Amino acid sequence: MDTKFDDVLTGEQKLRNFNINFGPQHPAAHGVLRLVLELDGEVVERCDPHIGLLHRGTEKLMETRTYLQNLPYFDRLDYVAPMNQEHAWCLAIERLTGVQVPRRASLIRVLYSEIGRVLNHLLNVTTQAMDVGALTPPLWGFEEREKLMVFYERASGARLHAAYFRPGGVHQDLTPRLIEDIEEWAEHFPKVLDDLDGLLTENRIFKQRNVDIGVVTEKDILDWGFSGVMVRGSGLAWDLRRSQPYECYDEFDFQIPVGKNGDCYDRYLCRMEEMRQSTRIIQQCLAKLRVEKGDVLARGKITPPPRAEMKTSMEALIHHFKLYTEGFHVPAGEVYAAVEAPKGEFGVYLVADGTNRPYRAKIRAPGFLHLQAIDYIAKGHLLADVSAIIGTLDVVFGEIDR
């Protein structure tokens, strides 16, 4: 008998699930993500992420460079908010060497970390809206990001790969004019957020595409190792800036937005509110920077001497030459330094062996841990929901593939 038909009477055929490739050149794939989806009709049965298309061997390359030469690699991980990654690397080196960062440098770091957070959330919220069909938000969001990119450029000389944070402080001071301009931007930015709010938050279609999609429970968070907005969207108030304060975050007055349902919509709301809180921190930072004067680098073995000193002192010139050729030596030891990056907990586990190069540096990218759960989260959803889920996981492949 022909086995093609299961049931002789009804003549029903055996159903075969349908496999499709989502990405790597799909606009909603956010970079070079390739998902192999197994579909039963339009329902996702399996969602298999294939990563590694942007793998550059960063962690291995870092073992052959000096500590200072390794800094720019961090800009190229999460290239949406580069300075937040540099921060973790600098903190790791400072903990091993015991360097005290000057207060003004500490404030500038917090300022630019929060600008990075706004840069990231603006991109994420608006492109996620585009993934579910709203075409106006990205245009507005990129207009604001452009202004912030200019602030990056005016501080460091580069719009994207800044290499501005240095072990011991920041590369150069901010001009009074730049501080005024950031202040002016921070005053009008909440109005832009209100406009975005008006477009999306109560939009019926946006809600239908996001509410109860990609729900993550507290147990899932602990099982999969989530961090950042993925945690806070589900009701856990875990933010490293508050729970394990680094730099001078403990001086600032800000709130941690927390969701309730752990779905895509709550994560969107968290990101919107985080931008408001970041603006508050930026304003407090600027007020402190007006009062706090002083150097922006801890002058010593791991930082270059001032330019003026190099013109007159032979020792300063030798120090400068040695610093940029041989680099500084970090005492043997191991340390884990983590920052609350926009996407979650970005950590660096650094093992030093007393030389001028790291023995091993392990980078903990939050997006990597979020993407590993895509099969678990997307199973049972419709094909159209996959792009909404990827959007709120907030994945960037620089840091996932490393």
UniProtKB/Swiss-Prot annotation:
Quaternary structure note: NDH-1 is composed of 14 different subunits. Subunits NuoB, C, D, E, F, and G constitute the peripheral sector of the complex.
- Provide the family line: Belongs to the complex I 49 kDa subunit family.
- Top-level division of the source organism's lineage: Bacteria
GO terms, molecular function: NAD binding; NADH:ubiquinone reductase (non-electrogenic) activity; quinone binding
User: Where's it found, cell-wise?
Assistant: Cell inner membrane
Identify the SUPFAM superfamilies for this entry: HydB/Nqo4-like
| Taxonomic placement | Bacteria, Pseudomonadati, Pseudomonadota, Alphaproteobacteria, Rhodobacterales
Its recorded name reads NADH-quinone oxidoreductase subunit D
Provide the membrane topology annotation.
Answer: Peripheral membrane protein
EC id: 7.1.1.-
Q: Which NCBIfam families match?
A: NuoD, PRK06075.1
Output the Gene Ontology cellular-component terms.
plasma membrane
Catalysed conversion reaction: a quinone + NADH + 5 H(+)(in) = a quinol + NAD(+) + 4 H(+)(out)
Matches recorded under Pfam families: Complex1_49kDa (PF00346)
HAMAP family in the cross-refs:
NDH1_NuoD (MF_01358)
Q: What is its main location?
A: membrane
Q: What does this protein do?
A: NDH-1 shuttles electrons from NADH, via FMN and iron-sulfur (Fe-S) centers, to quinones in the respiratory chain. The immediate electron acceptor for the enzyme in this species is believed to be ubiquinone. Couples the redox reaction to proton translocation (for every two electrons transferred, four hydrogen ions are translocated across the cytoplasmic membrane), and thus conserves the redox energy in a proton gradient.
Give the record's keywords alphabetically.
Cell inner membrane, Cell membrane, Membrane, NAD, Quinone, Translocase, Transport, Ubiquinone
Instruction: Give the enzyme's main class according to its UniProt record, as a single word.
Output: translocase
Record PANTHER family: NADH DEHYDROGENASE [UBIQUINONE] IRON-SULFUR PROTEIN 2, MITOCHONDRIAL, NADH-UBIQUINONE OXIDOREDUCTASE 49 KDA SUBUNIT
